[in-house]
Curated annotation (Swiss-Prot):
It is a peripheral membrane protein. Gene3D superfamilies: 1.10.10.2360, 1.25.40.690, Peptidase S59, nucleoporin. Signal peptide: none annotated. This is Nuclear pore complex protein Nup98-Nup96. The modification N6-acetyllysine is found at residue 603.
Length: 1816
């Protein structure tokens, strides 16, 4: 071709490069000489040239070589082009008898022996391509001659001929609470579709019958197999499209041909692609999978093999070469005795020995491992190596010098054969399909097409097209690039060296960092990974069923002691532990926490004590330590010193450090262990993980107390003790063997009282445990067969009866009954010293008894008592489960001590019982008493302010001379005013005096003196010396009182106003706040009663404390200078992130609280405040004058007015609809709070509609009223009464109702569009009448449109308009007319407005014009007119409103912009504004008009009401809920009730708030009364009344209250109670008592009268005022509900009545009976006056006045009773009353000292008089 003229025919002439023909022979088509590619045509033995002219040393070619070892007797063409004589070998070696494609005796479609690719080498008897009858097998196994040669589709599969392929599916699996989708495989062969009709036994029987009892090779060649497994069958006239054959190559489909006839080329019966289950069918390689072969075959089976590796005989290669060895099938295993798989190789497709198709341990291409380039492993599929795969090689892909050489030019092996059967010599670069396509660089080897190849060390070769190249080979088809010599020597010589090198590279690949466990396995073994991924892998199954190592709250296993998982001698670091753990397991360490490599653990190795040692009480009852003792979390788990050297890997110490049993009893410490305590406790866990674990344990994260309390080791210890003790069977079956437990009666006594039936019934049974507590069961208890060991568990601070609830009997049976439980040793633990608090005073201070009572109440028990001496907690239970005190209960309620924990130095404690004396200094000033000491001395909270931003002055050295007096524990905490004074630098004592002088409302001077002590004079230096920071004890005032003794002691002075005596206070163990003990400088001592008011230290060594104020920032730092400037992006610090922003607080009635600038108002006073003097004349020392400036940290309270004040007309818009609503509502008073419900029906709709229709014109001009009018008239049209329907006698049909509603809705549409239409017509009537006509049409005003068209001369248009209401045919004719205009392009000459009318008349909303324009009928129309067009013109006249609405929705909701032709239903305030509404985030709630929502609700009864009632669908004001609320009530009347409770609440609360802001709070109550929930309704109404009820009586307030009580039926008591709250706020006690009485709160009214009003009335003798209150409270039905009525109110009332009775007696003569009755009343008062409670000095004054007055009354009454003669003129003399009748009553009266002295004087005189009279 390349060295000859181009005139040579396709097959003739001498070829290039010295050959005789271009492609082999000098022949044309049909001659008997050379083939297409240099050979004879399918088997001739001509010595012809190659493709490019190379001469061949051996005959052979692509399709016709003699490689099949058959003699060639004639020549033929390559593809059968031309004649052929004699016999020749075809592609696959069968004998042909002279065939030709075009000119032989057998034509192409009826030949006997076809050639080519139809039937390669088959011998047939007759038949053509489409209808031949074949009797012998072709290389594809067909008996008939189509391309793929299927034979039969009728044979059913017998046995397991099809490889098992598990069907896959999907399923869901829940893991860790998360549901995930997983893939499943059904591992059963009967689950396959092919075998679903058979059982396992049937399949096994068929396999036995077919002699399939072992592994079957699925690929080996057999006799007469098809291309893809079809077996041959004898049939006649087989054709590609119409044959009668029954076999198909691919086994697809059914037994039909491709064009509907009986069979097809793809329609065999047995299913799979690569080998079917038919015994008769054959696969690609001449045998089905799993069948043994008995005869050799040619063709694509390339040298027969047995099934999947079984031996076969007489195998050949692709072109007939006998193979050197006989390894496995296509994908099968390699054997030692068989070859002939896919392409003449001995193993899998790519050469790997396999056990079967896809078996475990192999891949598709036969690889064992996937290695990198350049490595050599046990197997690697190079191309063309030892008895190879697809291209003759066995090992995996290695692109380098190898012991196995490749057919791709990478070295071949001696025994391997190439794809086309050539047998390369030793040490050659063999042939193959690779880069050296067809070349063989080796010892005399022929190429693919017969070319001579140079040896590896030979002369220069030729290139692809004759180009010379160094040591290169000649290639075909351009693949002949020069190949470098890879192995210049024999590759086998370097095999050992390569193996060693590959081993090193492999080890470096898999372990690049050596044996370090940290970097182990960076690259996982693919084979191992594939094995792990298989579900049948045991490791995978174990990992699936094994729980994870760590859980959030792992529950400790029952009685499982942690074991050491490692030996103690190992010095291995824990840093890399756990990195190489492949799979989890359920070993003992599964639940043990492992050290985290992310935590830095610093061990303290110096064993030094961080804190001073604290003495502990070693008690058996001590509870486990909960806080660290000298750094250790649990003292009883502390390690000894020698354990510090223990290996850290010991899990015992590791687990015990992080987990402990919270119920476990502490280990008693021996003296030896106590001696090591300091050393063991020094091992401080100074890590975060330890702190976290401690916090977790402290918070109870190790498990609930109920769980851990049962499953601890104390129960096991008890059981062990039971087993070791001697066990004797009790006669009644009672079991109690636990050590320490006892019963009352004892077990022996119980045995004695057991009856003959073996029953033991005992009364008042008690079971207890020594030192822990007992349980007392009252009544008869049946103890028969009770195992008390398992039932009763009494432990420290808890008791459990019936651990297992399943075994618990019903309440009242067994021990599950009422009982009294006593738990001993229940004391709290001091969190500082870890000692038990046993002091009764300490227990009382922390209110431990109250805490136990609260715990008892929480557990359902009844608290009885607590005995601090023994720590006994007694409570009663009604039934049993578990009761006790947990650690969380002890920490639940923290009672801070009355003093702060600022610890100071202490002085020695004086001996008990020593009299405390005050020492006097030389200048007469008293010295402080000796100071005492307690284990922990704390400074008083009154002295030290604990403000967060105050400088801690307690850390500074305290002067030694500063002293402080002894203060009892119950000292009151520091007051807020004291802190404020200290922060401002003011003397706190001075501030208290100033506050007391200004607020002298209830406390007199005595009370202030009692609280603050003596008022020092200006000249008194004691006040100057004494620091204002030091507290002045309340006890000093009591100590300084002069106690009046003897007969003249005043009961008034000795009442409840005295502080406890000094002796009582000395008995306490005081917590002192003193600093040091100052030595006395005075030799004199003064007794306690003569002490001064308060003590001060000596002035000589005194160094007074300075009043240190809180160092606050005086002003606001500018933002630029602040440390927070520019740090607003620090999201993790909320303070920096928020910066100086503040929260805006909204109050009631539009009140706004903010800390920024004022929104309005003047700032005139800013920075202009004049400093004022703060001198006060009564203060001992004036405070320095300070200027007051406005604080930068202030809060502004402003009332915002969103709008101007409403006019009366505006208020009518609020009131009128509400009045209409009230008119059509019903008030239910079934409950205390009335409920208002709407009347069902549509009457309220007509009421609203009539109101808006009759409103004044100026009111209707308001936009909001316009919209209200549209809404109510639409409701009337949709749901209201229609005259047409009401006039009918019978019930109208549904069709008539729908039609009438349509007409009413049409009228509404016309009415709403009328104003806009009139405006448009007035503008376009003259200039553009067509537009005016269209405007009339949008309002359904057809007659006016016709008239206008006639007036403008457009008569034809008028004629068309008159037919709008006609039939559908008019619209169809107009549509045809528009189509004709469009076709003729005449519409371009018609005005757009006229076309718009025509489109409207034709019922086309959008019409496409010929000029690529559109006519949109709905353009520039609002949504209501657009909807009207759809209803009137685009739909039939009978269409309903719902259908028109649906069509309109499609017009504006279409997803495609081009399909949208109508505007959305925007609210009226947005229509025409030009605003473009953006897409809402929530597509379910678009912004649409309320009328549209009403139409949707009419169409769909279940339409959502939330968006309908949205204020934005009505008005631009989002807070205007007027129409929304009224609409909701109307819909409720129509039985639309599917609004959520939350939305309903928001609606009602918002509208009520709106009314409240307008001043219509009484109507807001009306709105609240519609709430269905009675509790919420009452609360809302009461809160509203409290905010707005006024004390002043005005006509307006009276009218509102009348409206509430009469029309809304609100209880009047609620209004009075609200007024009482208002009076309390204004401190008007009189009105507060009055309204409390009216509200029915008798007890509160009585308390207020007695405490604040009675004293003033008694002192001022305003008896009628006080009597008015008390007599109203006196009736029994009221007084019985009043607390302390007998000792308070009734005493005052009786006193007033006695005075009135005395006045009446003095004015009118009275009988002796009245005097006797009066005497009884007076004597009763004498006994009860002292019972009146006194709260201040005014109460005591009133009490004393009453006492003196009653004493005089008693004298008068007695004198009247003892007058000698009633008729005499002598006046009664009170001084002559007998002493025996007067003295007992006078002595009971609580009179002050002066009154008492006066009475004593009188009684003395009477006594002396009686003595004198008696002596005479």
């Amino acid at each position: 071709m390349f060295n000859k003229s181009f005139g040579t025919p396709f097959g003739g002439g001498t070829g290039g490069f010295g050959t005789t023909s271009t492609f082999g022979q000098n022949t044309g088509f049909g001659t008997t000489s050379g083939g297409a590619f240099g050979t004879s045509a399918f088997g001739s033995s001509n010595n012809t040239g190659g493709l490019f002219g190379n001469s061949q040393t051996k005959p052979g070619g692509l399709f016709g070589t003699s490689s099949f070892s058959q003699p060639a007797t004639s020549t033929s063409t390559g593809f059968g082009f031309g004649t052929s004589t004699g016999t020749s070998n075809s592609l696959f070696g069968t004998a042909n008898t002279g065939t030709s494609l075009f000119s032989s005796q057998n034509n192409a479609f009826a030949q006997n022996k076809p050639t080519g690719f139809g039937n390669f080498g088959t011998s047939t008897s007759s038949g053509g391509l489409f209808g031949t009858t074949n009797t012998t097998s072709n290389p594809f196994g067909n008996t008939s001659g189509s391309l793929f040669g299927p034979s039969s589709f009728t044979a059913a599969p017998t046995g397991t001929t099809i490889k098992f392929n598990p069907p896959t599916g999907t399923d869901t699996m829940v893991k860790a609470g998360v549901s995930t989708n997983i893939s499943t495989k059904h591992q059963c062969i009967t689950a396959m579709k092919e075998y679903e009709s058979k059982s396992l036994e049937e399949l096994r029987l068929e396999d036995y019958q077919a002699n399939r009892k072992g592994p079957q090779n699925q690929v080996g060649a057999g006799t007469t197999t098809g291309l893809f497994g079809s077996s041959p069958a004898t049939s006649s006239a087989t054709g590609l499209f119409s044959s009668s054959t029954t076999n198909s190559a691919f086994s697809y489909g059914q037994n039909k041909t491709a064009f509907g006839t009986s069979t097809t080329g793809f329609g065999t019966n047995p299913g799979g692609l690569f080998g079917q289950q038919n015994q008769q069918t054959t696969s690609l390689f001449s045998k089905p999978f799993g069948q043994a072969t008995t005869t050799p075959n040619t063709g694509f089976s390339f040298g027969n093999t047995s099934t999947l590796g079984q031996p076969s005989t007489n195998t050949m290669g692709l072109f007939g070469v006998t193979q050197a060895s006989q390894p496995g099938g296509l994908f099968g295993t390699a054997t030692n005795t068989s070859t002939g798989t896919a392409f003449g190789t001995g193993t899998g497709l790519f050469g790997q020995p396999n056990t079967g198709f896809g078996a475990v341990g192999s891949t598709l291409f036969g690889n064992n491992k996937l290695t990198t380039f350049g490595t050599s492993t046990t197997s690697a599929p190079s191309f063309g190596t030892t008895s190879g795969g697809l291209f003759g090689n066995k090992p995996t892909l290695t692109l380098g010098t190898n012991t196995n050489t490749s057919n791709f030019g990478f070295g071949t092996n001696n025994s391997g054969s190439s794809i086309f059967g050539s047998k390369p010599a030793a040490g050659t670069l063999g042939t193959g399909l690779g880069t050296g396509f067809g070349t063989a660089l080796g010892a005399g080897q022929a190429s693919l097409f017969g070319n001579n190849q140079p040896k590896i060390g030979g002369p220069l070769g030729t290139g692809a097209f004759g180009a010379p190249g160094f040591n290169t080979s000649t290639a075909i088809l351009g693949f002949g690039a020069p190949q470098a010599p890879v192995a210049l020597t024999d590759p086998n010589a370097s095999a050992a060296q390569q193996a060693v090198l590959q081993q090193h590279l492999n080890s470096l690949t898999y372990s690049p960092f050596g044996d370090s466990p940290l970097f182990r396995n960076p690259m996982s073994d693919p084979k191992k990974k594939e094995e792990r991924l298989k579900p049948t892998n045991p490791a995978a199954q174990k990992a699936l069923t094994t729980p994870t190592h760590y859980k959030l709250t792992p529950r400790p296993a029952t009685r499982v002691r942690p074991k050491a998982l490692q030996t103690t001698g190992t010095a291995k670091s824990h840093l890399f532990d756990g990195l190489d753990d492949d799979e989890p397991s359920l070993a003992n360490g599964a639940f043990m926490p492992k050290k985290s490599i992310k935590k830095l653990v610093l061990k303290n190795l110096n064993n030094s004590n961080l804190f001073s040692p604290v003495n502990h009480d070693s008690e058996d009852l001590a509870s486990p330590s909960e806080y660290p003792e000298n750094g250790e979390r649990f003292s009883f788990l502390s390690k000894p010193v020698d354990e510090n050297h223990q290996q850290d890997g010991d899990d015992d110490s590791l687990v015990s450090r992080f987990y402990t049993n919270p119920i476990a009893k502490p280990i008693p410490q021996t003296p030896e262990s106590a001696g090591n305590k300091n050393n063991s406790s020094s091992n401080v866990e100074d890590t975060f993980i330890a702190l976290n674990m401690r916090a977790a344990l402290r918070n109870g994260l190790e498990g609930s107390s109920e769980e851990t309390s049962f499953h601890d080791e104390s129960l096991q210890d008890d059981r062990d003790e039971i087993e070791n003790s001697a066990f004797q069977i009790h006669p009644a079956g009672i079991v109690l063997t636990k050590v320490g437990y006892y019963t009352i009666p004892s077990m022996d006594d119980l045995a004695k009282i057991t009856n003959e039936k073996g029953e033991c019934i005992v009364s008042d049974f008690t079971i207890g445990r020594k030192g822990y507590g007992s349980i007392y069961f009252e009544g008869d208890v049946n103890l028969t067969n009770l195992n008390l060991d398992d039932i009763v568990h009494i432990r420290r601070k808890e008791v459990i009866v019936y651990v297992d609830d399943n075994q618990k009997p019903p309440v009242g049976e067994g021990l599950n009954r009422k009982a009294e439980v006593t738990l001993d040793g229940v004391w709290p633990t001091d969190k500082t010293s870890r000692c038990l608090i046993k002091s009764p005073d300490r227990l009382a201070d922390i209110n431990y008894e109250g805490r136990l009572e609260a715990v008892s109440r929480k557990q359902g028990a009844q608290f009885k008592e607590y005995r601090p001496e023994t720590g006994s907690w007694v409570f009663k239970v009604s039934h049993f489960s578990k009761y006790g005190l947990q650690d969380s209960d002890e920490e639940e309620e923290e009672h801070p001590p009355k003093t702060t924990s600022k610890k100071l130095k202490t002085a020695p404690l004086p001996p008990a019982g020593q009299a405390t004396t005050f020492q006097m200094t030389l200048n007469g000033k008293p010295a402080p008493p000796p100071q005492s000491q307690s284990p922990e001395v704390e400074q008083l909270g009154r002295v030290v302010e604990l403000d967060s931003d105050m400088v801690d002055i307690t850390q500074e050295p305290v002067p030694d001379s500063v002293l402080e007096e002894s203060v009892p524990e119950d000292q009151e905490p520091v007051s807020a005013s004291t802190q404020i004074a200290s922060s401002l630098g003011i003397n706190p004592h001075v501030l208290q005096i100033m506050k007391a002088s200004l607020l002298v409302d209830e406390e007199d001077v005595d009370a202030m003196e009692q609280r603050f002590g003596h008022f020092p004079s200006r000249g008194d230096t004691a006040q100057e010396i004494c620091s204002p920071r030091l507290p002045i004890s309340a006890s000093h005032s009591s100590k300084s009182r002069s106690i009046v003794g003897g007969l003249l002691q005043s009961k008034f002075a000795s009442g409840t106003f005295l502080s406890p005596s000094a002796s009582v206070q000395e008995c306490r163990t005081p917590r002192t706040s003193s600093l040091m003990n100052v030595p006395s400088t005075s030799p004199w001592s003064v007794p306690l009663p003569l002490a001064t008011v308060f003590t001060v230290p000596s002035p000589a060594p005194e160094v007074p404390l300075k009043t240190v104020g809180i160092r606050r920032q005086p002003g606001l730092v500018p933002l630029e200078k602040s440390i927070t400037y520019g740090k607003g992006k620090l999201l993790m610090d909320m303070a920096l992130f928020m910066g100086r922003s503040f929260r805006v607080g909204w109050g009631p009635n539009w009140t706004l609280a903010n800390s920024g600038e004022q929104l309005h108002g003047s700032h005139e006073l800013e920075n202009h405040q004049v400093a004022e003097s703060m001198e006060y004349g009564f203060l001992p020392n004036p405070v320095a004058v300070k200027s007051l400036s406005e604080s930068p940290f202030k809060v502004h309270l402003e009332k915002l007015g969103l709008r101007q004040r409403k006019l009366d007309e505006d208020l009518q818009l609020y009131q009128t609809p509400l009045e209409l609503k009230l008119k059509h509502s019903t008030v239910h008073v079934d409950e205390l709070c009335p409920l208002i419900v709407p009347n069902p029906g549509v009457s309220v709709i007509h009421g609203y509609a009539d109101w808006v229709k009759k409103s004044p014109r100026d009111l209707l001009e308001l936009p909001i009223v316009k919209h209200w009018s549209l809404t109510w008239t639409l409701c009337e049209a949709l749901w209201g009464h229609l005259k047409e329907l009401d006039s009918q006698l019978d019930e109208p049909s549904e069709y008539i109702q729908t039609l009438e509603r349509r007409r009413a809705f049409s009228r509404w549409l016309s009415h709403t569009a009328a104003p806009q239409i009139e405006e448009e017509v007035s503008l376009t009537r003259r200039d553009s009448p067509i537009e005016a006509v269209f405007s009339y049409l949008t309002g359904s005003r057809i007659s006016e449109a016709c008239c206008l068209a006639q007036q403008s001369g457009d008569h034809r248009l008028a004629l068309l308009l008159s037919q709008l209401v006609g039939s559908q045919s008019v619209r169809e004719l107009l549509t045809m007319q528009l189509a004709d205009w469009h076709q003729l392009q005449a519409d371009s000459f018609i005005h757009d407005e006229r076309l718009r009318i025509f489109a409207l008349l034709a019922g086309k909303p959008v019409w496409q014009l010929s000029e690529q324009k559109q006519i949109n009928v709905c353009s520039q129309l609002d949504w209501k007119r657009t909807l009207a067009i759809h209803l009137w013109y685009l739909l039939p006249p009978t269409a309903s409103i719902s259908r028109a609405l649906s069509m309109y929705e499609e017009a504006f909701q279409n997803t495609c912009e081009g399909d949208k032709y109508a505007c959305p239903p925007l609210p009226s305030y947005l229509e025409g504004s030009g605003c473009v509404v953006e897409e809402e985030k929530d597509p379910q709630r678009p912004l649409q008009d309320v009328c549209f929502h009403l139409l949707k609700l009419y169409s769909d009864r279940h339409y959502g009401l939330n968006q309908l009632l949205e204020p934005r669908s009505i008005t631009a004001d989002p807070l205007d809920y007027r129409l929304s609320w009224h609409l909701w009530e109307v819909l409720r009347a129509l039985n639309y009730t599917h609004l959520s409770e939350q939305c309903e609440g928001v609606l009602q609360a918002s509208y009520a708030g709106q009314l409240e802001s307008e001043g219509l709070w009484e109507w807001a109550i009306f709105v609240f009364l519609h709430i269905d929930n009675s509790g919420m309704r009452e609360k809302a109404v009461r809160e509203l009344l409290t905010r707005h009820c006024q004390l002043s009586e005005t006509p307006e307030s009276w009218a509102k209250e009348t409206f509430l009580t009469q029309k809304l039926c609100v209880p009047a008591e609620w209004i009075h109670e609200a007024k009482a709250v208002r009076a309390h706020m204004e401190s008007n006690k009189h009105l507060e008592a009055l309204y409390l009485f009216k509200a029915g709160h008798w007890n509160r009214c009585h308390k207020l009268v007695v405490r604040h009003l009675a004293s003033d009335a008694i002192i001022n003798e305003n008896y009628d005022y006080l009597k008015g209150f008390l007599e109203d409270l006196a009736p029994p039905e009221r007084s019985s509900l009043i607390q302390d009525w007998e000792t308070s109110g009734l005493v005052y009332l009786d006193y007033i009545r006695v005075i009135e009775m005395l006045h009446r007696i003095q004015q009118v003569d009275c009988s002796g009976y009245e005097l006797e009755h009066l005497h009884t009343k007076v004597t009763s008062l004498c006994n009860r006056i002292e019972q009146i409670p006194c709260y201040n000095a005014k109460d005591r004054l009133a009490q004393s006045d009453m006492a003196k007055r009653v004493a005089n009354l008693l004298r008068v009454v007695l004198s009247l009773q003892h007058t000698p003669d009633a008729t005499s003129n002598s006046t009664p003399d009170p001084q002559r009353v007998p002493l025996r009748l007067l003295a007992p009553h006078i002595g009971r009266l609580p009179m002050p000292e002066d009154y008492a002295l006066e009475e004593l004087r009188g009684l003395t005189q009477s006594y002396l008089r009686e003595l004198t009279v008696g002596s005479q």
